[in-house]
């Protein structure tokens, strides 16, 4: 069944196994990198810098300031700070403050092509 049909005719509900709901290290690394990176971009204020691109499109500095009011800038910069904080919390979760956390095991390919549990 396709994913689109599953929206209108969902499969029966079932209990998820523990392995299906466990966190994984690659997921944690990617969410940390995205949160810190995008949060840094927003917190830096770069999205609100008037530059050559806006001038080339014929947008004046006063028009640019109207399109980006102060409350909008503060909101996005604050959200960027929250993303940075979330990224550091997420990145240190398994080894700093939640030391008993279990992660999914992945099967690795050995040199002879067989899979082995990690």
From Swiss-Prot:
A GO-annotated cellular component: peroxisome
Native organism: Saccharomyces cerevisiae (strain ATCC 204508 / S288c) (Baker's yeast)
Official protein name in the record: Uncharacterized protein YDL157C, mitochondrial
Keywords: Mitochondrion
InterPro entries: Mitochondrial_unc_protein
Organism domain of life: Eukaryota
Other remarks on this protein: Present with 752 molecules/cell in log phase SD medium.
Main location group: mitochondrion
Subcellular location: Mitochondrion
């Amino acid at each position: 069944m396709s994913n689109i049909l599953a929206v209108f005719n969902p499969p029966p509900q079932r209990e998820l196994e523990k392995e299906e709901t466990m966190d994984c290290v690659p997921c944690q690394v990617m969410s940390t990198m995205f949160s810190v990176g995008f949060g840094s971009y927003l917190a830096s204020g770069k999205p609100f810098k008037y530059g050559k691109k806006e001038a080339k499109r014929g947008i004046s500095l006063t028009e640019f300031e109207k399109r980006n009011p102060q409350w909008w800038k503060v909101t996005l910069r604050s959200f960027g700070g929250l993303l940075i904080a979330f990224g550091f919390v997420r990145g240190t979760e398994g080894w700093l403050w939640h030391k008993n956390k279990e992660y999914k095991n992945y099967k690795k390919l050995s040199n002879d092509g067989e899979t082995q549990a990690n």
